[in-house]
Amino acid sequence: MTRKPKPPDEYCVTAFNSMRANLYRWGKPETDIRSMTRQYYVNIHDSGKDNIMLIIEKAMKYKLSSSKKTTTDDHYTRPQAQAYMIYDNPDKYLSSYDVFKKIFFDARKTIVVAKEENDLFRNDTTNDGYNFNIKTRSDKLYQKHGVKLYRYSGSGKWTNRTFTPVSYDDMIFNDEALLNEERFIN
């Protein structure tokens, strides 16, 4: 059975409408903030991914050796932090679907990483439902952990692909989202 491709625009519309509908709850002491920011994150995650053809060295080694160790796709731009930015600036992000859509599709970008590295990156963020904290801005996280990035090309078997070392500058970030992250750094 062939799977029907996920329609990312549908997930984007759902996130936009859900966030607009729940905006009145934002900032109220009784509101579990995580329940609101997850609306954005879950729709990003469930909408699929836009792989930017980057892979971390350890994941590359796993793929090339057909290792039993697992890899995953890291939504490296921290969509939950972006949800705070959207709720805090509804006049900008929730009044125009086109503006929202750009942020949404920026957040769908992924990099192939080893599962244990993804766990390490995840530990850089804490969220208890009311307090959201990060230790390192997204554009510095991979550097902090000393991972090496490669751009890959080709398709099919990983052993048939070409890998080229690249700098961290090849990662694509939204500047407004990065500035927003600074308020969560502790």
Regions found by a protein language model. Give the residues of each.
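Nuclease and nuclease-like effector domains acting on nucleic acids or nucleotide cofactors
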Residues: 1-68, 125-127, 134-153, 157-179
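Charged, low-complexity, helix-prone segments enriched in Lys/Glu/Asp/Gln
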Residues: 13-22, 81, 100-107
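Histidine-centered nuclease catalytic patch
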Residues: 66-105
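A structural signal for short, well-ordered beta-strand segments and their strand-loop junctions
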Residues: 72, 111-115, 151
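"Short basic amphipathic alpha-helical interaction patches in structured regions
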Residues: 86-92, 126-135
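Long, compositionally biased interface segments
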Residues: 180-186
